[in-house]
């Protein structure tokens, strides 16, 4: 190996002396207007060589002096931020000791602590090719029962005669088992070593934790993970030779084009819609995105084609840098691919830690053709489809060669993403607790929803395990199977609470989930007591709210309307739009209080957002609330604050514990903020309520109160509407008509404002079946009447 790389180094030094290749790179801010991205792409400027700032309207790019001349000749306003990138990248590591940085990181708290054998490399903190391969050899020496020795993918070698290596991690790595396969690659582009370094970190981590982490053990035992850390071997060695301290800016491979130029962009050379247009790739040899003379003309793409066609990869992560993005097909067209919903749902979960913006490559950055993701997913005749992603690792300051102190944090922030890729290749599913925060009766049920996410079918067993002595009994486990990808099954397990449970008591149990390989356990905390509805609005009007939101009649959760930020179309750019509850809600006697509502949204992820806020001082200050569906904001939003963005097309029930505001008067506000970039349909909410447990009221099993009159529904059966007549001889507020299913699950509460009258009930959103209706006031309730929904 040493002799081979000595020869290769000599060849690269000779190539480096070709005048046309002495390229100077700079970091430039390019001001953008409508249509400018297309103009840049047509000029051969790489549109994946930097970060877009939609809010301020510029593209921060790392480009050659030749490309900078093109940009200026097109009339763009520019600002040079760094004149000599290679020197700048190397200089900012001066005085930094990689070993000291590693030791400091090992002492820091992290969900993914630094593996003992992981090392930073000698090339600006990144491993050289020899160092990378030495790590693969070291892993095989340490864990021969879990990882293969490095192997050549193919007899085909690179332009300079180098093999492309892979390793496989599994419980029987040298045996071809019938297990889901996942692919990880790094360095399609020679100046993007963070992908390689992350894969080394990830491999060391899962190997070192195999015997101590049961979930990781089961993942490795039931998955075949394939790693190709360096695809563009020649290009990377060229950068190591020209800039041994890091900062080399060569992107392409080292193909001699015969006209004084070198290199083909490997990630424009795959065969699916190769050369579709001259914006997504370039026909000109000197351009950074030169696609070559034909699809798969390059040995690197030929090798990867062979690798994919001789395996059955379910998911692939092709690591790149930089822009804090997670991209997926299509790249060549803005039309969504057939599995767009699956890609989006996976992405939402994979970016939960790093908060990368996700979306189709064509619409999230700019159309590209001949890319790895489009071919891996789109080619389905010579192989099965692969759900292929491109993580673009690093922010605008990290660039292509992050400072050595940033390498480990970048490796760590992508760990969840890489782990989920393996899990999603298998029978992975998610279990969601849907039991109301307030349990109203001692004989009740734990409600849950199971969603199959993984590419492999599985059988799932759900059970509840009581904590403490509050439970008299629990029901049998529930078994669910034969779900399709993204299909959700709703079910429940009955339980009974003991006589020792009193009003406002906390109830705790474990919701256990066995997917056939390992068991996950989540502790669930609820409260026992009679729910008192102190606010309910299903938006027949907007009388309870002020601001610029309005009613929307299409697809409400319950007719006739839902509340929307922009009921007449997409929200506008640079919007700050709120709707605020006019009257305060009193939580004076509450021990527990819950805000709940149904919501759906379509909001540009990573930039625009909605927050739900609460105020306990009549609106002087507002605090954002954390719910089941919020996540921390990115650097382009409100960093770390809970918010909603992305796409949730179906109504979901949000439930937020606001018990910390018990004893106070509160107001609620919804706020949408947008930047100057992409706009979307916005945020919708419906059936908003505030429910509490009243500490002044003892909890009893509700008794029938003979003086409450409730009529039979009319019509019955009902389709969209039915009417109930009622008469309360003793009306004292906090009274409503409850709608429950036959299991006793509370579906809806309709507040009653008068002692008697007729009330029209919208039934259009109820599923067909039988329901029980009754009047509830505190611990008392009327007889139940049956309603049949057609």
Predicted feature residues:
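Metallocarboxypeptidase
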Residues: 27-30, 163, 240-241, 245-443, ...
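Residue-level detector of functionally pivotal "anchor" positions at catalytic/ligand-binding pockets or at interdomain
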Residues: 428-440, 532-542, 573, 691-714, ...
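Extracellular glycan-recognition surfaces and repeat-rich motifs
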Residues: 534-578, 623-652
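Extracellular beta-strand-rich recognition modules
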Residues: 539, 587-601, 610, 665-674
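C-terminal outer-membrane/trafficking sorting elements
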Residues: 4-7, 15-20, 703-714, 718-790
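Extracellular carbohydrate recognition
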Residues: 607-609, 674-693
């Amino acid at each position: 190996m040493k002799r081979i790389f000595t020869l290769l180094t000599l060849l690269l030094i000779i190539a480096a002396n070709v005048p046309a290749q002495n390229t100077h790179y700079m970091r430039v801010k390019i001001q953008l207007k409508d249509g400018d991205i297309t103009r840049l792409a047509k000029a051969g400027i790489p549109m994946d060589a930097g970060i877009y700032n939609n809010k301020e309207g510029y593209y921060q790019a790392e480009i050659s002096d030749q490309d900078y001349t093109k940009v200026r000749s097109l009339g763009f306003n520019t600002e040079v931020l760094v004149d000599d990138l290679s020197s700048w990248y190397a200089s900012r590591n001066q005085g930094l000791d990689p070993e000291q940085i590693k030791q400091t990181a090992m002492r820091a708290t992290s969900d993914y602590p630094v593996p003992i054998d992981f090392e930073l490399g000698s090339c600006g903190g990144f491993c050289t090719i020899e160092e990378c391969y030495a790590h693969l050899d070291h892993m095989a020496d340490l864990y021969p029962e879990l990882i293969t020795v490095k192997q050549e993918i193919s007899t085909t070698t690179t332009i300079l005669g180098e093999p492309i290596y892979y390793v496989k991690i599994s419980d029987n790595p040298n045996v071809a088992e019938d297990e889901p396969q996942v692919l990880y690659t790094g360095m399609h582009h020679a100046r993007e070593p963070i992908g390689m370094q992350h894969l080394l970190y990830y491999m060391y981590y899962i190997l070192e934790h195999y015997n101590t982490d049961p979930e990781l053990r089961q993942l490795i035992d039931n998955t075949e993970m394939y790693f190709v850390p360096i695809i563009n071997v020649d290009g990377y060695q060229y950068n190591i030779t020209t800039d041994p301290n890091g900062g080399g800016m060569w992107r392409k491979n080292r193909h001699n084009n015969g006209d004084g130029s070198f290199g083909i962009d490997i990630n424009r050379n795959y065969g699916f819609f190769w050369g579709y247009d001259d914006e997504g790739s370039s026909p000109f040899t000197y351009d950074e995105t030169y696609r070559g003379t034909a699809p798969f003309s390059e040995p690197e793409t030929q090798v990867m084609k062979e690798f994919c066609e001789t395996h059955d990869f379910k998911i692939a992560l092709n690591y790149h840098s930089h822009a804090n993005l997670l991209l997926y097909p299509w790249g060549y067209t803005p039309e969504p691919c057939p599995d767009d919903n699956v890609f989006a749902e996976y992405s939402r979960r994979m970016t939960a830690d790093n908060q990368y913006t996700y979306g189709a490559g064509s619409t999230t950055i700019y159309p590209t053709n001949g890319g790895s993701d489009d071919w891996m997913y789109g080619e389905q005749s010579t192989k099965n489809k692969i759900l292929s992603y491109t993580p673009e690792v690093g922010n605008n300051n990290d660039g292509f060669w992050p400072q050595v102190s940033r390498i480990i944090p970048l490796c760590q922030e992508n760990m969840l993403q890489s782990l989920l890729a393996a899990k999603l290749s298998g029978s992975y599913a998610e279990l969601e607790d849907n039991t109301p925060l307030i349990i109203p009766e001692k004989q009740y049920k734990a409600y849950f929803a199971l969603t199959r996410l993984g590419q492999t079918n599985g059988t799932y067993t759900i059970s509840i395990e009581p904590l403490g002595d509050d439970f008299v009994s629990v029901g049998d486990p529930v078994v669910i199977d034969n779900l399709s990808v993204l299909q959700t099954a709703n079910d429940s397990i009955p339980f009974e609470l003991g006589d020792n449970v009193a009003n406002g008591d906390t109830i705790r149990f474990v919701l256990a989930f066995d997917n056939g390989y390992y068991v996950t356990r989540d502790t669930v905390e609820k409260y026992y007591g009679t729910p008192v509805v102190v606010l309910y609005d299903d938006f027949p009007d907007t009388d309870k709210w002020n601001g610029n939101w309005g009613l929307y009649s299409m697809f409400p959760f319950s007719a006739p309307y839902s509340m929307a930020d922009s009921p007449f179309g997409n929200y506008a750019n640079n919007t700050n739009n709120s709707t605020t509850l006019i009257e305060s809600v009193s939580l004076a006697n509450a021990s527990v209080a819950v805000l709940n509502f149904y919501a759906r949204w379509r909001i540009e992820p990573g930039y625009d957002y909605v927050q739900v806020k609460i105020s306990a001082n009549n609106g002087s200050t507002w605090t954002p609330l954390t719910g089941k569906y919020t996540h921390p904001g990115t650097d382009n939003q409100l960093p770390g604050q809970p918010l909603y963005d992305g796409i949730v097309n179906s109504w979901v029930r949000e439930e937020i514990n606001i018990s910390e505001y018990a004893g106070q008067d509160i107001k609620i506000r919804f706020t949408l903020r947008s930047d100057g970039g992409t706009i979307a349909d916005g945020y919708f909410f419906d059936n908003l309520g505030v429910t509490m447990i009243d500490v002044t009221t003892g909890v009893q099993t509700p008794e029938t109160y003979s003086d409450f009159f409730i009529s039979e529904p009319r019509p019955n059966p009902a389709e969209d509407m039915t009417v109930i007549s009622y008469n309360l001889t003793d009306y004292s507020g906090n009274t409503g008509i409850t709608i429950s299913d036959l299991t006793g699950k509370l579906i809806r509460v309709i507040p009653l404002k008068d002692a008697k009258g007729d009330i029209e009930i919208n039934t259009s959103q109820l599923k067909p079946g039988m329901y029980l209706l009754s009047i509830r006031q505190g611990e008392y309730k009327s007889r139940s009447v049956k309603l049949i929904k057609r």
